Amino acid sequence: MSRPGGSTGVLTDRQVDIIATRLAERVSGKPADRPAPRPPVAATTSAPRRAPTSAPREALGDGVFATVDDAVDAAATAFHELDGMSLEGRQKIIASIRESMFENAEELARLAHAETGLGRVEDKIVKNRLVTRKTSGTEVLTPQAVTGDSGLTLTEYAPYGVIGAITPTTNPTSTIICNTIAMVSAGNSIVFNVHPNARECSMANVRLIHQAITRAGGPANLVTAVATPTIESAQELMSHKGVRLLAVTGGSGVVRQAMTSGKRAICAGPGNPPVVVDTTADLDHAARNIIAGASFDNNIVCVDEKEVIAVDSIADELVQRMGHHGARVLNERELHKVTNVIFTEYPGRRQRATLEKDLIGKNASEILARAGIASHGDPRLLVVRVSNGHPLVWTEQMMPILPITTAPDVERAIELAKEAEHGFGHSAGMYSRDIDALSRMARTINTSIFTKNGPFFA
């Protein structure tokens, strides 16, 4: 798929206006005012569009509210209406949401990329369509019955009510779609406080969902959002008496605040997912799939592979095969140049470095250009051999740069992977034909997601 906006991969302001106008027309059902031509501006690939500091009055409606109180009150009313509907009615709502989100997956992806400047449009389209199709719906709400000498016990699922959801700038639209389908299927309503740097695409997403719900006969404002999201509005949502459950996707700070809010919280925080490759692995299969996973959306997805620990004896061949499958393998001199531009603070061995935020989620070619390294074509991933203690191994870099380090045997590789994962319990994986080794690593690292012989997004 060709990338929008020419060789830089970033949409112009004019293109953003066209996409936003098209989405507004779909939501309202009538033509929107076409944007006036803008004077030409210098192209840039590093500075994302700034989110507005206030929402104009015409931006409200279709689930978008000026205050947290208004959004929660409206969602509470909608929840009670939904609670009175049949499960069949809820199924129609979810079907309508899926249809709308699949139809608008591409435009939402382009709008998210244009606003945030992160990742790749083609991968964001995949994410939007994947969560639209695969997120569980009402079909999983199966009652469980247990009968015995003492009688019959029937267990049925019940909704919480109003859920407060906080979403990231890395995966703004796909997170909203996933949360909505899962939470509404379970009978809840939602108030979103989105990341300020992804406000425009997120508001467009909420409006489309609102339209899909009401079109299917569902209650208005079942899914709402705060028009001008801030840190303060997120804190207000977390402490609001009308919110019974929090669902937070973000960094360690916002996750920590949610976990200490006094409310029940479901949180997805930071990770540093390692992948181990041992001597029994199919190296060509491993190389191809590690590249696919680590390069996906320029590595901004929290489950993407962040470092490889390979057993010494197969490391050279693994790196060679990665090069054959399209990765750009950096030499020692190029590694030095790249680390000088991607890190603003370089603390030393086995320490997490501070990232250059302007390069998070950027294409590999842009990182190479910033480092003064010639690039041919558009490599999806940079691969580099490093020592065990290199900061790339210990830092969740969220860039298409994959460090490969080594261990003398599979046991030490698993131990190093556990250390590099920092105990987050997020994601990890392994390539091996040794069932015992696969099971041993899964038990040892004990992450929420453990992938065997495949990319982590599988």
Task: Kindly label every feature range from the protein language model.
Residues P143-H285:
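Rossmann-like NAD(P) dinucleotide-binding subdomain of oxidoreductase/dehydrogenase enzymes
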Residues M1-L154, A182, H324:
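N-terminal Rossmann-like NAD(P)+-binding subdomain of aldehyde/semialdehyde dehydrogenases
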Residues R3-G6, L11-E25, G29, T138, ...:
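C-terminal segments
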